[in-house]
Structure formats: structure tokens, C-alpha cells
């Protein structure tokens, strides 16, 4: 395992966490000031993993963001024998290192899309990057969806013209609820096991994916910050959030990885919305 690679990736994920939290708090402040309200602030709590490593949860429950969580973690140790066969390169001795950031935003307004994003770096006897971002609007708009996709396409095209179509397809396939035969949202990009043989290039790409999110999602939120919405629209949002919960508990790799490596349960389930309904 490469100590330098572990340090620079972990440092970047911490830096990205700080940038995201600062921008989301700024949005809270803009809205609260206009409405004469007290803005929400992120509350941080750290946790340690018995087998090695730990992380920091940052959660804000505000006036714009009903619940937004930004997690960073760096964990290491050995996979259980039952889990080794599922992770590339872990079948030899089970040793692993994983560092990353994961964030999920659930907005009060049903007109503003929910958003999920994560990027990570993992080492076993092999090493790779993974991650992506996806948008879940309750009332989809073509222009908004196109803008979200364009930001990630621009990041992808800097490195390989084949990245965006490949990663978009993987996102569409991954965020699909098989039991309901419907997509979770309008997609984005999703990549995993990325190792081109050039660590610096793959790391730079992963950084640009994070920067792409910062360039587009705050703008999407601000565009609808002051739009009025109805009780009926809120009710529909709560029902559609059920799909989000179903996916995360049934299919999400990150949820499974966290639970199988004895991660912090509250951090793992942070992605779940604070309020949800089933019809």
C-alpha cells in the first residue's frame, strides 16, 4: 500500500468536505436573511472504527436543507473472510484501506431535487477510484437535468471522451430499482474500479468530479430557492422519497460496504431522509 497516495486522497476528501459545507451554509444564510430566519449550521461529530480508522459526520438541518449530510472517512484493516471474495484484490490476505467522501442532500422544497454524491479511493492488493453524482428531482425539468449532466460531461471529457457515455450508462444501470422497474432519478455519472495505470490522472479526474458538483448543484438550489410550493407537492415528495430509501437499503454498495466493514451505522444510514411516506 502506498502511504503518499493514501495521504493525498484523504486530504482532498477533507478539503472537498469543507468546500461543500461552506457553500451549503452560504445558501442557508442567503435564504434565512431574506426571510428573517435563523440559518441552519452543520454539526460535526467524529467516530472511530474498532478495526482501524474512523471518520467525521457533518449534518445540517436547516431552512433550505431539510437534512444534508457530508461524511468523510478513512478506514483500514482486514475484510471478513465472507466479504473478501466480493472485493477485487482482497482475496489474498483481506487487507484494505478506504478513504472517501459521501454526501446526500434532502431539501424542504419539493421543487428542488435531492442530490447524492460520493468519491472514494480504495486499496487492497489492487487500487482504484470510484464515485459519481446523481440527481433525484420530484418534478423533473429538462434544462435542469441537462445542466447537471453537462457539468459532469465537461469533467469527463478532459480525460477521455469515452468516460461520460460509459459512466452515464453505468449510473443509469446502477440507480435502478429492479423491484419497481423504474430509475431512482435522472442520473448523472457513476464509476468504479477506475485504474488507468496513471494514479495522478485518475486522482485528478476524481477531484474534477467533485469540483463539477460544486459548480452545478448550488446553482440548481438557488434557482428555486424562493419558489412557492403546495401541500400536495410536499406530499408527493415524501412518497417519492420512499424510492430513495428502498434503493439505499436494498441495492447501495456503499451501505453494504460500510456495514460489512463495521463502519459507523449512523454515518452509513445518514443518506436516509428525515421524513418519508409510502402510499
Swiss-Prot record:
Catalyzed chemical reaction(s): coproporphyrinogen III + O2 + 2 H(+) = protoporphyrinogen IX + 2 CO2 + 2 H2O
Family stated for the protein in its record: Belongs to the aerobic coproporphyrinogen-III oxidase family.
Gene: hemF
Role this protein plays: Involved in the heme biosynthesis. Catalyzes the aerobic oxidative decarboxylation of propionate groups of rings A and B of coproporphyrinogen-III to yield the vinyl groups in protoporphyrinogen-IX.
The protein's required cofactors: a divalent metal cation
Start and end residues of each stretch annotated as Important for dimerization: 244-279
Any one GO biological process: protoporphyrinogen IX biosynthetic process
Active site (UniProt): 116
Assembly behavior: Homodimer.
Keyword Repressor in annotation: no
Chain sites annotated for binding a divalent metal cation: 106, 116, 149, 179
Assigned EC number: 1.3.3.3
Localization in the cell: Cytoplasm
InterPro entries: Coprogen_oxidase_aer, Coprogen_oxidase_aer_sf, Coprogen_oxidase_CS
PROSITE patterns with a match to the protein in the record: COPROGEN_OXIDASE (PS01021)
Cellular component GO terms, alphabetical: cytoplasm
Disulfides per UniProt: none
One term of GO molecular function: coproporphyrinogen oxidase activity
Pathway(s) of this molecule: Porphyrin-containing compound metabolism; protoporphyrin-IX biosynthesis; protoporphyrinogen-IX from coproporphyrinogen-III (O2 route): step 1/1
Cleavable signal peptide: none
UniProt keyword Cytoplasm present: yes
Binding site for substrate: 102, 118-120
Sorted UniProt keywords: Cytoplasm, Heme biosynthesis, Metal-binding, Oxidoreductase, Porphyrin biosynthesis
Biological source species: Rickettsia bellii (strain RML369-C)
Name by which UniProt lists this protein: Oxygen-dependent coproporphyrinogen-III oxidase
